[in-house]
Amino acid sequence: MPELPEVEITCRGIRPLVAGRTLTALEVRNPRLRQPVPADLAQTLVGERLQGVRRRAKYLLLDFPHGSVLVHLGMSGSLRVVSADEPAGVHDHVDLVFGAEALRLRDPRRFGLVLWHAGDGLSHPLLAALGREPLERGFTGAWLHEATRGVRLSIKQTLMDAHRVVGVGNIYASESLFRARIHPLAPAGAIGPQRLARLVASVRETLLAAIDAGGSTLRDFVGGDGRAGYFQQQYFVYGREGLACRVCATPVRRVVIGQRSTFFCPRCQRR
């Protein structure tokens, strides 16, 4: 699933290409995504100017004068700018057309979202209750220590709880915990403030490194310019079960936490 880095890369990639332009057409080839694409979306938006593109958690917000289109890439989606006359593939479900170019949603598993919200998109129910952005100033060790006080849930699950912290999905949670030398099964409330401060720094470091590398392309992800990411080549633990730890050569282990595969080094990340 595209996580925060992939969505941020998409946002940065498409923003300069479409922001400020007028929507000339909107084509929905298959409205059956996780929720149906609104049937009147074209009627609402064609002729309107796209004022800006921003990210909140794993959502993209396409801001128009009277509201926002919310886009979620689901498990396998990508959003990129193509020539408007480029033939659509079987998994290309939605085009927002700006003259000679189109912003095209490709979603093989159709688990993404394209929704309309009148007014500020941040007030949409899917976004209003989300937690802190890990790349913003409010995400600190002191805040995380307070937010996890008394929490018995594992630190891995806590990092992936979008009501606390957004965008740190399965891949980057495993990678961040390795960099911080924290065992993924450690109860969040039992981790001291110094180690949590180190974890906050590791989360930021991991996410920024992934953004610099164009994100992770394990299957379908490409950025707004159509390029694949290569951060997967830098993974310390994710997907490396049985392979030697890049730091100490101990075999990397896999454990299922909250129904998600989690990877760690038993030597570098002692309980």
UniProtKB/Swiss-Prot annotation:
Q: How does it assemble?
A: Monomer.
The stretches annotated as zinc fingers (FPG-type) lie at 236-270
Q: What is its EC number?
A: 3.2.2.23, 4.2.99.18
The entry's protein name is: Formamidopyrimidine-DNA glycosylase
Q: Which cofactor does it need?
A: Zn(2+)
Fetch the SMART domains from UniProt.
Fapy_DNA_glyco, H2TH
Record: residues binding DNA: H91, R109
Catalysed reaction, written as an equation: Hydrolysis of DNA containing ring-opened 7-methylguanine residues, releasing 2,6-diamino-4-hydroxy-5-(N-methyl)formamidopyrimidine; 2'-deoxyribonucleotide-(2'-deoxyribose 5'-phosphate)-2'-deoxyribonucleotide-DNA = a 3'-end 2'-deoxyribonucleotide-(2,3-dehydro-2,3-deoxyribose 5'-phosphate)-DNA + a 5'-end 5'-phospho-2'-deoxyribonucleoside-DNA + H(+)
Q: Which HAMAP family match?
A: Fapy_DNA_glycosyl (MF_00103)
Report keywords, A-Z: DNA damage, DNA repair, DNA-binding, Glycosidase, Hydrolase, Lyase, Metal-binding, Multifunctional enzyme, Zinc, Zinc-finger
Note the coiled coil stretches, chain numbering. Answer: none
* GO molecular function terms listed in the Swiss-Prot or TrEMBL record: 8-oxo-7,8-dihydroguanine DNA N-glycosylase activity; class I DNA-(apurinic or apyrimidinic site) endonuclease activity; damaged DNA binding; zinc ion binding
Q: Which family does it belong to?
A: Belongs to the FPG family.
Q: Taxonomically, which superkingdom?
A: Bacteria
Role noted for this protein: Involved in base excision repair of DNA damaged by oxidation or by mutagenic agents. Acts as a DNA glycosylase that recognizes and removes damaged bases. Has a preference for oxidized purines, such as 7,8-dihydro-8-oxoguanine (8-oxoG). Has AP (apurinic/apyrimidinic) lyase activity and introduces nicks in the DNA strand. Cleaves the DNA backbone by beta-delta elimination to generate a single-strand break at the site of the removed base with both 3'- and 5'-phosphates.
Q: Which residues form the active site?
A: P2 (schiff-base intermediate with dna), E3 (proton donor), K58 (proton donor), R260 (proton donor)
The UniProt note on the cofactor reads as follows: Binds 1 zinc ion per subunit.
- What InterPro entries would the database entry show? DNA_glyclase/AP_lyase_DNA-bd, DNA_glyclase_Znf_dom_DNA_BS, Formamido-pyr_DNA_Glyclase, FPG_cat, MutM-like_N-ter, Ribosomal_uS13-like_H2TH, Znf_DNA_glyclase/AP_lyase, Znf_FPG/IleRS
**Which CDD domains does this entry report, sorted A to Z?**
EcFpg-like_N
Q: Tell me the Pfam families matching this sequence.
A: Fapy_DNA_glyco, H2TH, zf-FPG_IleRS
Q: Name one GO biological process term.
A: base-excision repair
SUPFAM superfamilies associated with the record: Glucocorticoid receptor-like (DNA-binding domain), N-terminal domain of MutM-like DNA repair proteins, S13-like H2TH domain
